[in-house]
Amino acid sequence: MGLFRIDFLALWLLLLRLATAAAPVPTKDGFCFKYIIQGYDTCALIAKAHGITEADIESFNKNTWAWLGCGRLYQGDFICLSTGKPPMPMALPQATCGPQVPGTTRPANWANLAGMNPCAESKCCAFWGQCGVTDIYCQNCRAPPAGPTATVKGATEAPKSQTSSNTKAGGANQSVNTAAGSKPTSNPNSKSNTTTVKATKITTITKSSTTTKAKAAPEPSVSQSPWTAPWEITLYSKMGCEGDYYHLEGYNKEFLDNKGCLNLHGGLNSKFTETGVTCKWWTDDGFTWSSCDSSKLMKPQSWILKNGYCSAFMFD
């Protein structure tokens, strides 16, 4: 009986040890243990599943790209669950600026990360990797505090009131000149034909100037419409979100078939659009892309989903 109790206690201790997750450790080359944030993740759940604390997560990610703290986690982001060098952020197929442009290599100095692939002068790089001048681009709440601050010009101004004033002033001067020119007309000795010619000439100049000023169109202002994030799904050829991948994003169901299912090889548009569905096939570690029709991958092994829901079904 005593032996049975000892064996039972040993089994219980073994199960308890197995149930307690071992804390993640850095890789052999000094990088932190990388974790991909999933839907509905919280720091509390992540910490419990990996045998660490929320304070550990905050500490490990002080230098992680776009880290805003445990209160603001973004699905699909890479974070650290151990000490070590932070990972490069996930490449975004539609990115044209910042470190998430596909093919961007890790900088020798991590402090230079935010300045990689900069926008043209006077434009800001938004956290989703595109350039613009409106507040949604320039109030980049996800850029690390140490990153460079973009210099932004104000919105295009409407025609200044000075131009209007000059027009009025010009008109006033001409009125004065007209009045001054009309003084000789009050002289009975002046010839009527001379007066008529002068009045006509002044009137013509005034009308021409006024008409030209009135037709000047105001400069177009920058649209302030809010940016709407599309749903995105990235399907990888290997486990752990590695290898070649499909990247799809969209706003509506215009390109879905009658069964409500996306056809990866159904001629989906490969150019970015703000209204439809886009599909690209990325190869060579994200350096090159082609249409999804050119891929032969039929069974993706892992995926990342943003701004949407995913359901998996088993079938024969």
UniProtKB/Swiss-Prot annotation:
Induction per the UniProt record: Highly expressed during the infection and development of decay of apple fruit. Does not affect lesion development on apples.
Disruption phenotype: Exhibited slightly lower rate of radial growth.
UniProt entry keywords in alphabetical sequence: Chitin-binding, Glycoprotein, Signal, Virulence
Iron keyword on record: no
Residues carrying sugar: 173, 193
SMART domains for this protein: LysM
Signal peptide: 1-21
Recorded superkingdom: Eukaryota
Any one Pfam family match given in the protein's UniProt record, by short name: LysM14_C
Ranges of residues in domain LysM: 33-81
GO MF annotation list: chitin binding
Region span, Disordered: 148-203
Compositionally biased tracts (Polar residues): 159-180
Compositionally biased region (Low complexity): 182-203
Further remarks about this protein from its record: In plants, chitin acts as a microbe-associated molecular pattern (MAMP) that is recognized by lysin motif (LysM)-containing plant cell surface-localized pattern recognition receptors (PRRs) that activate a plethora of downstream immune responses.
Domain writeup: The LysM (lysin motif) domains are small globular domains involved in binding chitin in eukaryotes. LysM3 contains one LysM domain.
Biological role: Might have a role in sequestration of chitin oligosaccharides (breakdown products of fungal cell walls that are released during invasion and act as triggers of host immunity) to dampen host defense.
Family: Belongs to the secreted LysM effector family.
Protein name listed in UniProt: Secreted LysM effector LysM3
